[in-house]
Amino acid sequence: MKVVVFAYHDIGCTGIEALLEAGYEIQAVFTHADDPGENRFFGSVAQLCAEHNLPVYSPEDVNHPLWIERIRELAPQALFSFYYRNMLKQAILDIPTVGAFNLHGSLLPAYRGRAPINWCLVNGEAETGITLHQMTAKPDAGAIVAQQAVTIADDDTALTLHGKVRLAARALLEQELPKLRAGDIRLTPQDESKASYYGRRTPADGELHWHRPARELHNLVRAVTQPYPGAFSFAGDRKLTVWKSHWLAQQSDKQPGTILSQEPLRIACGEGVLEIVAGQAEGGLYVRGAQLARELGLVEGMKIGAKASNALRKARLTRVLILGVNGFIGNHLTERLLQDGGYEVYGLDIGSSAVDRFIGHPNFHFVEGDISIHTEWIEYHIKKCDVILPLVAIATPIEYTRNPLRVFELDFEENLKIVRYCVKYHKRIIFPSTSEVYGMCDDHSFDEDSSRLIVGPINKQRWIYSVSKQLLDRVIWAYGKKEGLNFTLFRPFNWMGPRLDSLDSARIGSSRAITQLILNLVDGTPIQLVDGGAQKRCFTDIEDGIEALFRIIENKENRCDGQIINIGNPDNEASIQQMAEILLAKFEAHPLRDHFPPFAGFKLVESKSFYGDGYQDVSHRRPSIANARRLLDWEPTIEMEETIGNTLDFFLQGAVTTGVEHD
């Protein structure tokens, strides 16, 4: 059987060796170039390929059309991925005739994602394993071919557990590869209800937070000990790395992080005590815990913890300027930032109905105003604040055809001023791009870094919003490249939830789809399905969206700098008609149903009669969220039906309270 292999790490070497022994014909191997900044403790796929005279490549982008075509020309019957670090696009997965298969270091569906071995140890698991499964566009979600369990011992570290998993992988492949070659393959779908997803780990994730239980901290130590960067804490500003530890169940009345004894070196935790068996001071040697204490001058009663200079810096709250704070995203984001306690929010908008509940909060400062008029106030606050979010825009489809020039003036021209102020004062801008920039893209899912942005002809005015946003994206990107602007672009995909638009805005046609449909139910008018409602969208709960946006603001390890990030839920894909049917069912079952008129039925309307001349629709809009998973460790969790129910309840409660309901 002819195969193409994507491989890295020891598991990659193991997979290639197993394929050769099973009689597979490896036509090409794709791997990664060694990272000089990485502690490479594992075998080299490139060296192994050289020893076996196998062609090996390390392309910058294996999903580039040129590489896809080269792989297609090889006509492989199967693809195998063994710890290859990049996602393969559907165009590659569709090439082999037998299928594409991945070897994942956990017992799927648990621990999908990155660094599963480290995460299992962090979480104190007693068992993990290895899974051979079909590859799909969604990471680690394909049907299972075979699995082999691995027991995790109390003294296992990431290195020893990796060795166990490698041996299990070898045994599993020796058993399954001959079957697969003979066509004897049995697939078991994954149970999505048991799925869990974990993102990549960074060295910063190794910080020891002493208020946690000692057992958790011990698990962290063994999860990231050598050859990984290690768990760490600080004595003042001096870093100490913990390479080996024990945990004790004994309790202490001392504050977490307090030194209880020097020899042995024991630290009070939120629950129990952690004993540092071996460690290393920054710039020092690997030594026993007692010697480490002496080198750092640690004595009983002292405290260790966060870096002292960082703690002083964090005493000042991060100042966030939100223009359009009263809008759907703005008011929900304000709530999340104030709940966190580490942020001071400055907001401007032409109204305050959605943020009145924050007035009086010591960390919320609101001014009523228009961004096209209050330019001096805006420039001053951009200079004053740390993070800028210009959320002001016209984002309702009917306005794209009804008021195209106003859309351009506000969405592009006014926001360009904000961008230039951020350049002038060297401020970080988090700019709301839009899923609309993808236009009529023909990809199965829209990728921030490779999908084409396809729009219609000039006489279709509805694209003025899309191209205004796209042009700003390009301007921001250029400022980042040429003048060092610190930016992140985020692209929301059909966020829904309470406080989305208003029924009044729906009455004049200036609202999103679900608000318009709810108005039809409240008023007892037919639900209008534009062009039959066949258009598909991926609906995202506002809570999921705001959590992702909050993590962009947090920007751990500066991961989001210079990035474009889709924020959507690809699993919540449905047509407008399907959404309307779910909405109707929830409306009929709602406790307030009797306050409103009978359902008036569905009415099919043409887009031209609803939106006017110049409208053109999009058949589907499905995001790739690989960037969000990788950069934010984020995964949407809320199903569409729950979101629809919450949105409906908000509007019905409001209608009853204000007396809008049917008499």
From Swiss-Prot:
Q: Supply one GO BP term.
A: response to antibiotic
Entry binding sites for UDP-alpha-D-glucuronate: 395, 400, 434-435, 462, 494, 528-537, 615
Q: Which Pfam families match?
A: Epimerase (PF01370), Formyl_trans_C (PF02911), Formyl_trans_N (PF00551)
Where is NAD(+) bound in this sequence?
Answer: 349, 370-371
**What are the annotated GO cellular component locations?**
membrane
Region: Formyltransferase ArnAFT, residue numbers:
1-304
Answer yes or no on keyword Transport. Answer: no
Name the chemical reaction catalysed here: UDP-alpha-D-glucuronate + NAD(+) = UDP-beta-L-threo-pentopyranos-4-ulose + CO2 + NADH; UDP-4-amino-4-deoxy-beta-L-arabinose + (6R)-10-formyltetrahydrofolate = UDP-4-deoxy-4-formamido-beta-L-arabinose + (6S)-5,6,7,8-tetrahydrofolate + H(+)
Q: Where is this site: Transition state stabilizer?
A: 102
MF terms (GO), sorted A to Z: carboxy-lyase activity; UDP-4-amino-4-deoxy-L-arabinose formyltransferase activity; UDP-glucuronate dehydrogenase activity
**Where is the site labelled Raises pKa of active site His?**
140
Keyword NAD appears in the UniProt entry: yes
Function, in words = Bifunctional enzyme that catalyzes the oxidative decarboxylation of UDP-glucuronic acid (UDP-GlcUA) to UDP-4-keto-arabinose (UDP-Ara4O) and the addition of a formyl group to UDP-4-amino-4-deoxy-L-arabinose (UDP-L-Ara4N) to form UDP-L-4-formamido-arabinose (UDP-L-Ara4FN). The modified arabinose is attached to lipid A and is required for resistance to polymyxin and cationic antimicrobial peptides.
Q: Which family does it belong to?
A: In the N-terminal section; belongs to the Fmt family. UDP-L-Ara4N formyltransferase subfamily. In the C-terminal section; belongs to the NAD(P)-dependent epimerase/dehydratase family. UDP-glucuronic acid decarboxylase subfamily.
* Protein name per its UniProtKB record: Bifunctional polymyxin resistance protein ArnA
Gene source species = Aeromonas hydrophila subsp. hydrophila (strain ATCC 7966 / DSM 30187 / BCRC 13018 / CCUG 14551 / JCM 1027 / KCTC 2358 / NCIMB 9240 / NCTC 8049)
| Upper lineage | Bacteria, Pseudomonadati, Pseudomonadota, Gammaproteobacteria, Aeromonadales
